[in-house]
Structure formats: C-alpha cells, structure tokens
C-alpha cells in the first residue's frame, strides 16, 4: 500500500513531517556524510544573528540523566556569511531550508527578516524568541505575550517568507504565548525550545557550565513538550511543529497524535547522526503496517478519542 507522508506547513509542502531541530546539525552540510538530507521534510539550520557571535565561555554542554544541557550561546558566523557562503552550498542537497533567526532587540529581528527576504534557497524563517531582550533587562522575548507579539509582528512585516515562531516552555501558560504569536502574524508554531536548567559540580562547588544556566533537551523533556503541543493545539488553529526529546518514530507519533503536523529531531542527532532519517523511515513503515494511507489522519487524533 502506498502511503502519503507529505504535510503542509505554513504554505510549504514537505515530503514528510520530519525536520531537524535548529542547532543540532549545524548548517546541515556538516552532517551530510552521515544523514541523507534530501530524505527529510526540511532542514532547520542553526540560529543566525545580524553579527557573528563567539558564543558562551566553556564548558558549554553537559550530559544529564536522559538529557543534555547546552549553553552554546548562539555561536554563528552572522547573517552575511550565511547568505554569501552557506546557503549556496546547501542548494545541492535538495531539501527545503528553514533559517532560524535571533536578535537582542525587536529591531534586530526586523532587520534580519528584511535581509533574508528574497534570498534564494530559503523556504521559511523560524523565529527564536527565547533570546534575552537587552532593552528589557534581559527578559527573554518569548516569556511575555507583548514582547512575543512585537517580535513576530516585525518579522512578519519585513518578509514575504513563511514565519514560524518557536515557543519557549519557560512560561506560566504557553497558550498565551501561542495566541500572541498567532495574533501577530505567525504562519506556524514550533515547540518547545529547551527548558532552563543548570548543573553544579559538587567537587569544585561551582556551576558546571561557563554560562551557569543552560537549556535542557533530550528524552527528559519529552512529556513536557507533548503536553505543550496538546495545549497549544487546542488554543490556536495554526500548524504546529513538535519537538523535545524525539529519539524514535514512536516518540514522534506522540507529538503528532497530540496535534503536531510535523516534528523536529534534535538531541538524538548528537547521539546518532542518522536519527532524523531513521525516524522518517520508521514513520512511513508504521503507516504501512497500520494500514493508514495518510499521516495527516493522525494529526491531533488523540483529541478525538476521549482526551
């Protein structure tokens, strides 16, 4: 039986619902020897900023039970290097490229969106709103509805590309943030970003990470992420991209049944460079084995069975 794995997200038709999560495969080309990028629904590259960033002081990453905490600090070569050097090289992989952007002010987000508008090789923008707003005392944009709306609105006004707002879980009620992003013009939402976390080195009696705090990802956050997708699916009508601890196709199915139209594989890529392709292949096999002709039949299905 031929099954349909294609999904529609923010005006894009993706061959399957499996994406890479930003920051876990670099700009994609680093993983090309190990991961068939053309077999993915889309490649989400690591976050870029207006100017190059050196990132946080080391140590930047540490393992925890069932997860990883990272504090890389958005190290990247800047948007001009992306446009000039990286995007032209990605064209050979035949996969939609979604560019993640971040700024320290609303104006920086607007300028990034404007700079990338019309650049060949970009399918959509993912707006990383978990960054601190330097004009508001370092409060992350994505933790407050008005700041979320301000960023998304400026990005929307400065680009014709589809806009995907990436939501932070470090909030009281993620539904209010989702509604703010939707009201400001987001075409889709991705969730969740990492959970704020830290580890203390008990021998040295000091925080282990150079930045003190980091972002927790991996299987430890999956139940939190599934809950968030479930709630946001009930609150807004936008397509959702679910992420957070997806290691297998079974994990991905949890997100899809909770309401995600697509999923992003992140931390698993650090363990197995071919993880995202394996999830995509195993999802297709699941559909065949279960006699399900179209993966879209499963989107939000758990809500229709008494949830």
Swiss-Prot record:
InterPro entries: Aldolase_TIM (IPR013785), DHO_dehydrogenase (IPR050074), DHOD_1B (IPR033888), Dihydroorotate_DH_1 (IPR024920), Dihydroorotate_DH_1_2 (IPR012135), Dihydroorotate_DH_cat (IPR005720), Dihydroorotate_DH_CS (IPR001295), Dihydroorotate_DH_I (IPR049622)
Catalytic center residues: 131
Gene3D superfamilies linked to this entry: Aldolase class I
SUPFAM superfamilies: FMN-linked oxidoreductases
Location relative to the cell: Cytoplasm
One of the protein's GO biological processes: 'de novo' UMP biosynthetic process
Pfam families found in the cross-reference section: DHO_dh
Cofactor: FMN
Pathway connected to this protein: Pyrimidine metabolism; UMP biosynthesis via de novo pathway; orotate from (S)-dihydroorotate (NAD(+) route): step 1/1
Co-factor binding details: Binds 1 FMN per subunit.
Keywords of the record: Cytoplasm, Flavoprotein, FMN, NAD, Oxidoreductase, Pyrimidine biosynthesis
Enzyme Commission identifier(s): 1.3.1.14
GO cellular component: cytoplasm
Superkingdom of source: Bacteria
Residues reported in the UniProt entry to bind substrate: 46, 70-74, 128, 193-194
Role: Catalyzes the conversion of dihydroorotate to orotate with NAD(+) as electron acceptor.
UniProt record similarity statement: Belongs to the dihydroorotate dehydrogenase family. Type 1 subfamily.
Subunit structure: Heterotetramer of 2 PyrK and 2 PyrD type B subunits.
Name this polypeptide is given: Dihydroorotate dehydrogenase B (NAD(+)), catalytic subunit
Organism: Desulforudis audaxviator (strain MP104C)
């Amino acid at each position: 039986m031929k099954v349909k794995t294609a999904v529609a997200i923010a005006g894009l038709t993706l061959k399957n619902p499996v994406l890479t999560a930003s920051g876990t495969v670099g700009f994609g080309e680093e993983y090309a020897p190990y991961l068939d990028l053309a077999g993915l629904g889309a490649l989400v590259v690591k976050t870029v900023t207006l100017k190059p960033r050196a990132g946080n002081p080391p140590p930047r990453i540490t393992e925890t039970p069932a997860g990883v905490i990272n504090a890389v600090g958005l190290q990247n070569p800047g948007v001009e290097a992306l446009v000039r050097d990286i995007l032209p090289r990605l064209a050979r992989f035949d996969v939609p490229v979604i560019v993640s952007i971040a700024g320290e002010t609303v104006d920086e987000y607007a300028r990034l969106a404007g700079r990338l508008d019309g650049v060949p090789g970009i399918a959509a923008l993912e707006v990383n709103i978990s960054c601190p707003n330097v004009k508001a005392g370092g409060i992350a944009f994505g933790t407050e509805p008005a700041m979320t709306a301000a960023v998304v609105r400026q990005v929307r006004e400065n680009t014709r590309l589809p806009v995907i707002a990436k939501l932070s879980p470090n909030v009281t009620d993620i539904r209010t943030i989702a509604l703010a992003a939707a009201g400001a013009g987001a075409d889709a939402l991705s969730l969740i970003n990492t959970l704020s976390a830290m580890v203390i080195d008990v021998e040295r009696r000091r925080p282990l990470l150079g930045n003190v705090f980091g972002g927790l990802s991996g299987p430890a956050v999956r139940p939190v992420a599934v809950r968030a997708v479930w709630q946001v699916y009930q609150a807004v009508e936008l397509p959702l991209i679910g992420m957070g601890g997806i290691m297998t196709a079974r994990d991905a199915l949890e997100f899809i049944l909770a309401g995600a139209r697509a999923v992003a594989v992140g931390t698993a890529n650090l363990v197995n460079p071919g993880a995202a392709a394996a999830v995509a292949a195993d999802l297709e096999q699941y559909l065949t084995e279960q006699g399900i002709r179209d993966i879209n039949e499963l989107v939000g299905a758990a809500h229709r069975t008494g949830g």
